[in-house]
Amino acid sequence: KEINSIYLNISWSDLGSWSEIFKILKSKIKKSFIKKNTFYRPWGLYRNYFRGENFLLKELIINRNSSISLQKHHYRSEHWTVSGGKPKITIGNKVFFKNPDETIFIPKGSVHRIENIYKKPVKIIEAQLGSILKESDIVRYKDIYGRIK
């Protein structure tokens, strides 16, 4: 099927070509997508990038001297890839220090945490796998921000 009209909420300009229109569309979609899918937390932020059946791809950014809760999930496992910084990761009673391009797997039901003890932000690409992929699937054990209920 052909599309013969596209609504753009932009100011008037002489675009000149379809490639210019696609550049504007791409930039608008990217900005609105990122803004809509960015969620701020006391430790930093996360962005949801892609959701499929039984999986979710996210980016976590943990600020310096911050950490996520010591927590577990009943319905999902997680696979983390470090894309920036040097996180301190706790899984059960084991502690790992990771570097960019290194990965770690968090099995469903495992107590875990990411800490940033350095100045540079920690960036993690998180792949969640499971039957329920909601923020409500968090059981917190320790939280420096007082979020344990």
What are these regions (language model features)?
Residues K1-F105, S110-R113, I117, L133, ...:
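Left-handed beta-helix
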